[in-house]
Amino acid sequence: MGLLTCMFSSNSKESSSVRIKDSSISHPHTGQHISIRTFRELKAQQMSNPTWKKTETCLIMEFSRSMEDRLEEVANLPTTHMPRQSIQGPKLRPSIY
């Protein structure tokens, strides 16, 4: 049996003790595909505030992307060109009074 790999992510309520824990355990075998078992644990209590506080989610996905993929994503972002501002000071209009 190969290396044991564990991944963890969780979400929790800010004002309560509601917690969701996701974890995956993989057991890679030499010369075989990785087998993954995923578990979800939900402990819910009375909710008073529906505000979510995210912690540790998407961390594994970000690290699995290659630098080439990230550079391509940045290159494809839309750009906004700002108009050039005049170096001169504001133009004064003559007063009619």
From Swiss-Prot:
Residues 77-88 have a biased composition (Polar residues). Keywords: Host cell membrane, Host membrane, Host-virus interaction, Inhibition of host innate immune response by virus, Lipoprotein, Membrane, Myristate, Suppressor of RNA silencing, Viral immunoevasion. It is a lipid-anchor. A lipid is attached at G2 (N-myristoyl glycine). The keyword Transmembrane helix does not apply. It comes from Tomato yellow leaf curl China virus (TYLCCNV). InterPro entries: Gemini_C4. GO terms for cellular component: host cell plasma membrane; membrane. The keyword Zinc does not apply. This is Protein C4. Belongs to the geminiviridae protein AC4/C4 family. Signal peptide: none annotated.
